[in-house]
């Protein structure tokens, strides 16, 4: 039977499905409950993508259960991660792309997460500027945001922006998709939570928060600037009274929308920018974390003089996370590789750290690269017998000599302050 796109009930083209698969293939990822991998689909796209397009255009597409795996968090706890099937990810990408094209132009300029031409660095820079203008910050932490978005309110939010029936149909089906737990049992959603691990979850979260928070605060408190990256939100206030009142209003707004703030992590912070000027009273918090950076009072060079500012730099939490990653890699045991090979293997990872955490106060990354250099010193001692029984200083001296002769070998060695010392 020959299918004609013009006669399909849902306006989805084969090109949309093919383009969506290209994006999914580029992002890689493992198989879902059906065991079908990206490589399997790539080897015979017509066998898999054509039936998917056929089902999506006829309205007969239903997602398979999402495979759940447990990922360790930095605090020792486990975080559930959902893995939809490859074909379900393709279907979600089709709708996510179309939905994003329709709604993104309506979003707040203060929303930075998972949007075209927006980035975390833009959010951090705007936050830095606003911290210089306003003395107080509300650091909001939503308890289990992605797991607690109410389905009814979410579907109403999507319907506010689009009346396309195929989008509303499939968003509803994805929210109702079952989850296969690690022990093999099937769990059905209880009317809340975005599609686990789904590529459509970010745009759905942005639609939901645009109505729940962005539009609400812009209308209610137009003078209070803010930055939002998905569920990470910073609100700026002129004084403590304004911050306290606004925080209570936000709590009530979230309660109305079936969200809850984390009491332990939500806090009001004083942005101290003057070394001589003390807070008007005893302040509990004078720093906060946002998108992997810590904002706090720091001495800065301004106009040829050292003055206090309130600026971002890589957070201790980020340093600790990367340090754990370095220890797990066991670089000091890679004695079967020459140092140049180790540098090549680590190049993209180190470059990624520098590109993200080195945008603001790059010098603060020194403590991170000190750990990496210590791993390399240990590698020298393990690699060469002549250093095993000697004091570690001699291995360090050897590594310093290599760094001096080949400063471009490791990405971080290109910066003098990050070399072995």
Please give the residue ranges for each predicted region.
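Core structural elements
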Residues: 65-66, 175, 179-180, 337-355
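Non-catalytic, polymerase-adjacent accessory regions of viral genome-replication enzymes
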Residues: 1-47
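Extended C-terminal regions of large enzymes
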Residues: 372-375, 380, 384-421
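Conserved polymerase palm-domain catalytic core
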Residues: 55-70, 74, 109-111, 115-118, ...
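Short, solvent-exposed helix-loop connector elements
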Residues: 190-194, 309-311, 328-342, 352-365
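Amphipathic alpha-helical blocks
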Residues: 30, 40-65
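Non-catalytic, peripheral interaction segments enriched in hydrophobic/basic residues
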Residues: 342-387
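A conserved non-catalytic segment of reverse transcriptases
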Residues: 173-176, 258-335, 351
């Amino acid at each position: 039977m020959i299918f004609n796109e013009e006669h399909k009930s849902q306006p989805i083209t084969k090109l949309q499905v093919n383009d969506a698969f290209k994006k999914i293939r580029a992002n890689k990822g493992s198989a879902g409950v059906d065991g079908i991998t990206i490589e399997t689909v790539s080897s015979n796209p017509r066998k898999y993508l054509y039936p998917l397009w056929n089902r999506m255009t006829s309205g007969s597409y239903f997602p398979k259960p999402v495979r759940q795996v447990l990922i360790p968090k930095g605090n020792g706890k486990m975080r559930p991660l959902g893995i939809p099937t490859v074909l379900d990810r393709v279907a979600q990408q089709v709708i996510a792309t179309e939905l994003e094209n329709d709604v993104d132009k309506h979003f707040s300029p203060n929303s930075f997460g998972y949007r075209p031409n927006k980035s975390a660095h833009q959010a951090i820079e705007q936050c830095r500027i606003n911290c210089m203008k306003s003395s107080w910050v509300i650091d909001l932490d939503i308890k289990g945001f992605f797991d607690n978005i109410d389905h009814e309110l979410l579907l109403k939010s999507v319907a506010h922006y689009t009346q396309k029936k195929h989008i509303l149909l499939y968003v509803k089906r994805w929210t109702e998709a079952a989850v296969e737990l690690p022990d093999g049992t099937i769990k059905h959603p209880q009317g809340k939570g975005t599609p686990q691990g789904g590529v459509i979850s970010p745009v759905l979260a942005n639609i939901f928060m645009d109505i729940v928070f962005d539009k609400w605060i812009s209308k209610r408190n137009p003078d209070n600037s803010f930055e939002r990256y998905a569920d990470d939100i910073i609100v700026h206030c002129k004084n403590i009274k304004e911050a306290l009142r606004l925080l209570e209003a936000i709590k009530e707004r979230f309660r109305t929308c079936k969200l809850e703030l984390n009491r332990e992590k939500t806090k009001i912070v004083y942005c101290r920018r003057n070394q001589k000027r003390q807070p008007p009273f005893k302040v509990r918090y004078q720093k906060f974390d946002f998108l992997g950076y810590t904002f706090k009072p720091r001495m800065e060079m301004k106009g040829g003089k050292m003055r206090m500012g309130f600026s971002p730099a890589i957070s201790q939490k980020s340093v600790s996370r990367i340090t754990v990653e370095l220890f797990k890699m066991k670089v000091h045991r890679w004695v079967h590789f020459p140092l140049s090979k180790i540098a090549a293997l680590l190049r993209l990872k180190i470059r990624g750290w520098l590109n993200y955490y080195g945008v603001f106060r790059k010098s603060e990354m020194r403590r991170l690269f000190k750990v990496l250099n210590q791993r390399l010193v240990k590698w020298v001692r393990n690699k060469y017998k002549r250093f095993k029984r000697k004091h570690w200083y001699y291995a360090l001296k050897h590594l310093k000599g290599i760094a001096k002769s080949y400063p471009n070998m490791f990405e971080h060695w290109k910066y003098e302050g990050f070399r072995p010392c």
